[in-house]
Amino acid sequence: MNQNLYPHLFQPLTEVTESDWQKVINTNLTGVFYCMKYELLQMQKQGRGAIVNNASIGGLRMAPGFGAYGPSKAGVIAITQTAALENADKGIRVNVICPGPTEGTGLMQDSIDAGAQDAEFLKNHIIPMKKMGTTKDIADAVVFLCSDMAEHITGMA
């Protein structure tokens, strides 16, 4: 998500306006609610299915400036886990991925454009494996969670 499109995304809670709060919550959480509601209704008719939502490491670990973003992504994790518990007996698995900084995304491109200091700091001091994730890494995780190899996994973040 490009910060230039969502300049209100990373602000302290006291600086988040009601309008900014609504934009972030509607984009990151309410949209997931509506998608899952209708996906689950269809999957319940089918008797099986798999949903993988996309949250963020920011939903697991809060940080200064995550006034609206962090709670919105934590909400995605919570609604995913609720749906997993409510639908496990119906043959439906619901999981959520929580990627961290990812090469090739708008946010990382913004950091690179700003001199790459943020990206290098993250890689060298925050990310245990010292390697940025890629969009392929994320896609591979989603494919696995949707596959029969993950038939016993539900409610995981």
Where are these regions (language model features)?
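Active-site helix of classical SDR
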Residues: 36, 72, 80
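Alpha-helical segment proximal to the catalytic Tyr-Lys
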Residues: 41, 85-86, 151
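Short, small/polar-rich loop/turn modules that mediate ligand/substrate recognition or access, typified
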Residues: 88, 93, 153-155
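A glycine/serine/threonine-rich, flexible loop-to-helix segment
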Residues: 89, 101-127
